[in-house]
């Protein structure tokens, strides 16, 4: 089955992944590609539509991102957003100008609803502006289809060539008609069907993995988290017993997690599973290491070394499966965005790794991964399991990792998760966990002065981990969690709750 494809061309804007999500919400498959992608590569991909993202540059900047002018003559509908709008105008000999007054935030916009882009919309609505330049003269063959008080060309079109540009950001919630506008572009301009689904994605991945692997042997990096679990099941459905799952118990797991993973995948799914007890090995490598990036790199490298050793025991292994998902790739940086933190499945891989990679989920957001898991028949409880980073509790114990600190964090986290479940909040909160911030403080217990650890509780709401907000957990639940931890976990005398959104913070503390 050939899927309809929309390309999102990345010019370094902060909302690029949100654009991709908006497209996929319409059951249309899209890929984000760098602006340096050649015309030949674009032709080979044969997209049904192209979207230019925003970006921080001016079209007149010395190193401003460009595209080949030929792209506009391919007969493929193009939608330019913000910088993408200005670039289209500049490339086609329109004029872009810096205004006296910058336009930023919620703005009233006048729409020409005779345009396919604004079909069935109000003549005046609210949009979100964030720009310093604007189009002062549209290219030949274009007409203005939207204006604001400060922007004489808030949108333009060449309906004959199916070229559209908008100065505002339709992908954000503050543009009240944005989702409808993108839907109009996809279905009225690009004439797409919207038939991409998680079931079709799974079918295509299974077929592709069969073809890629052939009769070769595959090893899977299984952590028991949602991502690696879904990846393992997809590959298992494709090649069966050619797959061996290696579960590295590095001593950085949550309470009782190792036994649960072994029971589910060995007994329930009938997979070839090897459990490697490597706690001492990992803690030895992490001894004296406090820097979070070094911890991630060390753990990533040691994981691969363990896999290589297990692979040699198994014989001729050609491929390694990883549960890398799209936000992992984004957070590890691209050519047009800054690196936020190295992901263990990306930045931590040694350059001399001996396996070819299979990453069946690298194009999916977390909610899409869960949907694939449901399609594959993975138990609901496992599919909705809490996200857990590959480095495990090593990045929830701030500073040097020791057995004592791990034990404290593990017990506190188990209590937090247990009380969240009792309160019926498991599926209402995206992610929740306890971490040890490496802070000690004075307290009083049993009429005696104490100087013990602080536990930080973190809980966030999100749909894809790209952005998140802190969860409004009822006070009575937080109160019970706090009282239980200080009473049941030794060396803890203070509990704090993290009320920071992402951005500016990341979900994990390290």
Swiss-Prot record:
Residues 5-195 form the Glutamine amidotransferase type-1 domain. The active site is at 82 (nucleophile), 169, 171. Its EC number is 6.3.5.2. ATP binds at residues 223-229. The keyword Nucleus does not apply. It holds the Pfam family GMP_synt_C. Pathway: Purine metabolism; GMP biosynthesis; GMP from XMP (L-Gln route): step 1/1. Signal peptide: none annotated. Residues 196-385 form the GMPS ATP-PPase domain. It is an enzyme of class 6 (ligase). Catalyzes the synthesis of GMP from XMP. This is GMP synthase [glutamine-hydrolyzing]. The gene is guaA.
């Amino acid at each position: 089955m050939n899927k309809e494809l929309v390309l999102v061309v990345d010019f370094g804007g902060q909302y690029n992944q949100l654009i991709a999500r908006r497209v996929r919400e319409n059951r249309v498959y899209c890929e984000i590609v760098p602006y340096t992608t050649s015309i030949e590569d674009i032709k080979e991909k044969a997209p049904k539509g192209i979207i230019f993202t925003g970006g921080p540059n001016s079209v007149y900047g010395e190193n401003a991102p460009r595209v080949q002018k030929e792209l506009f003559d391919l007969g493929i509908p193009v939608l330019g957003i913000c910088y993408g709008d200005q670039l289209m105008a500049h490339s086609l000999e329109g004029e872009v100008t810096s205004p006296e007054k910058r336009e930023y935030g919620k703005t009233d916009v006048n729409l020409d609803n005779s345009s396919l882009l604004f079909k069935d919309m109000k003549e005046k609505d609210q949009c979100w502006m964030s720009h310093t330049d604007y189009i002062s003269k549209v290219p030949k063959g274009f007409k203005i289809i939207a204006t604001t008080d400060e922007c004489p060309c808030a949108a333009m079109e060449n309906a004959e060539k199916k070229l559209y540009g908008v100065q505002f950001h339709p992908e954000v919630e503050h543009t009240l008609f944005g989702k409808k506008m993108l839907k109009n572009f996809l279905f009225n301009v690009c004439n797409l069907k919207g038939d991409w689904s998680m079931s079709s994605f799974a079918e295509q991945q299974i077929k592709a993995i069969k073809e890629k692997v052939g009769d070769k042997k595959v090893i899977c990096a299984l952590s028991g988290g949602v991502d690696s679990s879904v990846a393992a099941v997809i590959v298992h459905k494709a090649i069966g017993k050619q797959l061996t799952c290696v579960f590295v118990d590095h001593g950085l797991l949550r309470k009782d997690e190792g036994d649960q993973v072994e029971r589910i995948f060995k007994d329930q799914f009938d997979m070839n599973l090897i459990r490697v007890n490597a706690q001492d090995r990992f803690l030895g490598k992490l001894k004296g290491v406090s820097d979070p990036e070094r911890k991630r790199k060390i753990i990533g490298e040691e994981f691969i070394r363990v896999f290589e050793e297990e692979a040699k025991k198994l014989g001729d292994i050609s491929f390694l499966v990883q549960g890398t998902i799209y936000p992992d790739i984004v957070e590890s940086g691209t050519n047009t965005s800054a690196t936020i933190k190295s992901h263990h499945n990306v930045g931590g891989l040694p350059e001399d790794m001996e396996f070819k990679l299979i990453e069946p989920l690298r194009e999916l957001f977390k909610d899409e991964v869960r949907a694939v898991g449901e399609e594959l028949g993975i138990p609901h409880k496992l599919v909705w399991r809490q996200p857990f980073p590959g480095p495990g509790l090593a990045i929830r114990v701030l500073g040097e990792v020791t057995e004592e600190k791990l034990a404290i964090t593990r017990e506190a986290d188990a209590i937090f998760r247990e009380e969240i479940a009792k309160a019926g909040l498991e599926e209402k909160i995206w992610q929740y966990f306890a971490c040890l911030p490496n802070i000690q403080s004075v307290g009083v217990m049993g009429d005696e002065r104490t100087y013990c650890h602080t536990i930080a509780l973190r809980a966030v709401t999100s749909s894809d981990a790209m952005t998140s907000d802190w969860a409004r957990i009822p006070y009575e639940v937080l109160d019970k969690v706090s009282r239980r931890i200080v009473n049941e976990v030794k060396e803890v005398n203070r509990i704090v709750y993290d009320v920071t959104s992402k951005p500016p913070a990341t979900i994990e503390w390290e």
